[in-house]
Design a protein with these regions (language model features):
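Outer-membrane beta-barrel proteins
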Residues: 1-167
Length: 167
């Protein structure tokens, strides 16, 4: 932590799981943050988007509700685009609302036809402990000239060790 309250975090995932032969480091990112400005993350690999963060917030024992489904692929699942060399900004919370934006530049494997950007809002009202509501929206263009609007909306409530929610 710096004297002005800013923090700098560097993360590496050392698991030898990168597609490149012999690559030891997989996901990696650097984040600059402070209470006043929020946080800005640059992900060289393994970045996230708002749609990816909010696509399945309902409690479940498996990572995603569609895991293990044979026909579930990127074209049918509304989870936005993640990619290398991406940016993710999260503003500081204002009255329980947190705004964020994600950007993946054109030319990355995940964005062959143009840059990708999505937006998200998460609201955790201070008057209702345990309630969380979120919405994210973005537009993808996996096929040139064909855009697809995607949205993810969720609500969940946690009381003690019990969580109920819906997407």
């Amino acid at each position: 932590e710096l004297d002005n309250g800013m923090t700098l975090a560097v993360k590496y995932e050392a698991d030898n799981d990168e597609d490149d032969a012999g690559a030891f480091l997989d996901s990696h990112s650097i984040t600059l943050s402070s209470d006043e400005m929020g946080s800005l993350t640059f992900a060289g690999h393994g970045g996230a988007s708002n749609m990816d963060n909010m696509d399945d917030k309902t409690p479940n024992a498996y990572e995603e509700s569609w895991d293990g489904v044979a026909e579930a692929d990127e074209e049918t699942i509304p989870n936005g685009i993640t990619g290398n060399n991406s940016f993710f900004y999260t503003a500081p919370s204002m009255g329980g609302a947190t705004f964020s934006v994600a950007y993946v530049p054109q030319g990355e494997t995940a964005t062959p036809n143009g840059a990708y950007m999505d937006f998200g809002v998460v609201f955790k009202p201070e008057a209702v402990d345990g309630l969380e509501v979120g919405v994210a929206f973005g537009e993808t263009e996996e096929t040139a000239g064909t855009t697809v609007d995607e949205q993810a909306i969720y609500a969940k409530y946690t009381m003690g060790s019990i969580t109920a929610g819906m997407n």
